[in-house]
């Protein structure tokens, strides 16, 4: 019964065309960006037409896919990186840049949205793992290949790093050569910390070791007393006493115990034993407080795990609600509701034609349903015009 009240068709769909004044390369770039937006509604625009970020969570691990479009895109392939660095067969050795064949073989006719979707599908099929000892952020010490220096990462949750020198090298400090090789076997190399702010101007501490003190495996040393080349007290002994000392070990040991150097060693040993016992008693006194703090850390870690799980569930719920309230979803609901109102009005008209309804009841109910139908159609057309207008300026609804 739509012939009773013909509906006017909106001509707003023509407004979605490409804006004038753009070259074919720029139009292709906009089409690829639109493909990326349409394929992934949760993508965030960091810098218009330059940088985009897509977060996703897998196995309680949240990963940000950063998509950087070079100036000559799509003639140049995009630079796709992830943070934090991960281990996966589609990533490079550092776990930062995507080396997928779809990215390496990118052409201006490729579909960027499908490339990112295939990357996500591969991550879901073969979940990645965090890269070990990943302290450096992408682009910290060197520019990636194929990326111009004009673009910045602009991550809001990290402090900005100052520009690094291109020829900067990271060297490790070594202790003095007098340290035995056994000491180095018990030490592990520490990753170089990134320098930023005023900390880069501070001097690094250089460990020093006294070459005159032999060092043991635990890093502590003891300076032995100087042993003289001659013992003047032996000159006061007779030949028979010297002979007895040479032949009898007890006499030699008795004379040896009277040496001041040995007495000094015994005194130092006793002092060291006393200091060790005192330190052990202090450590035992600290045990209850350390155990309490350890339990507190465990409780807070458990609370952190629970809050993280709750946060991820709420983020998933927020994403679902955001999808349900998007412009395309609202437009679909309006279209269905308008169609339902139109069907109800058609049924009322058929009942009237069959004589099942009085004319007064027909006019009131039929006009009410048709008014609702026309209102919903008008809202749908207005929403379509708004979507077409915003799509020209690349602003996602």
UniProtKB/Swiss-Prot annotation:
Q: Does the keyword Phosphoprotein apply?
A: yes
Q: Which Gene3D superfamilies match?
A: Helix hairpin bin, Ubiquitin Conjugating Enzyme
* Name by which UniProt lists this protein: Vacuolar protein sorting-associated protein 37A
> Where are the Phosphoserine residues found in this chain?
18
What tissues contain this protein?
Widely expressed. Examined tissues include heart, brain, placenta, liver, skeletal muscle, kidney and pancreas. More abundant in liver. Strongly decreased or undetected in hepatomas.
Q: Name one GO biological process term.
A: protein transport to vacuole involved in ubiquitin-dependent protein catabolic process via the multivesicular body sorting pathway
Q: What is the lineage of its organism?
A: Eukaryota, Metazoa, Chordata, Craniata, Vertebrata
Disease implication from the record: Spastic paraplegia 53, autosomal recessive: A form of spastic paraplegia, a neurodegenerative disorder characterized by a slow, gradual, progressive weakness and spasticity of the lower limbs. Rate of progression and the severity of symptoms are quite variable. Initial symptoms may include difficulty with balance, weakness and stiffness in the legs, muscle spasms, and dragging the toes when walking.
**Family statement drawn from the similarity comment of this UniProt entry:** Belongs to the VPS37 family.
Annotated Gene Ontology cellular component terms: centrosome; cytosol; endosome membrane; ESCRT I complex; intracellular membrane-bounded organelle; late endosome membrane; nucleoplasm
Native source organism of the sequence: Homo sapiens (Human)
**PANTHER family according to UniProt:** VACUOLAR PROTEIN SORTING-ASSOCIATED PROTEIN 37, VACUOLAR PROTEIN SORTING-ASSOCIATED PROTEIN 37A
Known InterPro entries for this protein?
Answer: ESCRT_assembly_dom, Helix_hairpin_bin_sf, Mod_r, UBQ-conjugating_enzyme/RWD
Task: Report keywords, A-Z.
Answer: Disease variant, Endosome, Hereditary spastic paraplegia, Membrane, Neurodegeneration, Nucleus, Phosphoprotein, Protein transport, Transport
């Amino acid at each position: 019964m739509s012939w009773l009240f013909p509906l006017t068709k909106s001509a707003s769909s023509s407004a979605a065309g490409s804006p004038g004044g753009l070259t074919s390369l720029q139009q292709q770039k906009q089409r690829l960006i639109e493909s990326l937006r349409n394929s992934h509604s949760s993508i965030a625009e960091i810098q218009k037409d330059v940088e985009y970020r897509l977060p996703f969570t897998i196995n309680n691990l949240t990963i940000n896919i950063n998509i950087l479009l070079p100036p000559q895109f799509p003639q140049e392939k995009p630079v796709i990186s992830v943070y934090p660095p991960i281990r996966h067969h589609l990533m490079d050795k550092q776990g930062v840049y995507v080396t997928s064949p779809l990215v390496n073989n990118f052409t201006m006719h490729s579909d960027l949205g499908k490339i990112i979707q295939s990357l996500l599908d591969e991550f879901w099929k073969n979940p990645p793992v965090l890269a070990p000892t990943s302290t450096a952020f992408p682009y910290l010490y060197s520019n990636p290949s194929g990326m111009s220096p004009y673009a910045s990462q602009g991550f809001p949750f990290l402090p900005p790093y100052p520009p690094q020198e291109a020829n900067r090298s990271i060297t490790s400090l070594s202790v003095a050569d007098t340290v035995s090789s056994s000491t180095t076997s018990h030490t592990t190399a520490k990753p170089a910390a990134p320098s930023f702010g005023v900390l880069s101007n501070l001097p690094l501490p250089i460990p020093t070791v006294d070459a005159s003190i032999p060092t043991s495996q635990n890093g502590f040393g003891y300076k032995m007393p100087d042993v003289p080349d001659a013992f003047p007290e032996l000159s006061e002994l007779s030949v028979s006493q010297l002979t007895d000392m040479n032949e009898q070990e007890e006499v030699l040991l008795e004379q040896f115990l009277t040496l001041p150097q040995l007495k000094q060693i015994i005194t130092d040993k006793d002092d060291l034993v006393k200091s060790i016992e005192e330190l052990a008693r202090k450590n035992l006194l600290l045990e209850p407080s350390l155990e309490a703090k350890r339990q507190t850390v465990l409780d807070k870690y458990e609370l952190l795990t629970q809050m993280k799980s709750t946060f991820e569930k709420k983020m998933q719920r927020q994403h679902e609600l955001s999808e349900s309230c998007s412009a395309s979803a609202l437009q679909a609901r309006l279209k269905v509701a308008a169609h339902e109102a139109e069907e109800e009005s058609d049924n009322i008209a058929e009942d009237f034609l069959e004589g099942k309804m009085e004319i007064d009841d027909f006019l009131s109910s039929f006009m009410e349903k048709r008014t609702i139908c026309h209102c919903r159609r008008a809202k749908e057309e207005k929403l379509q015009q708004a979507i077409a207008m915003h799509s020209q300026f690349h602003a996602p609804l």
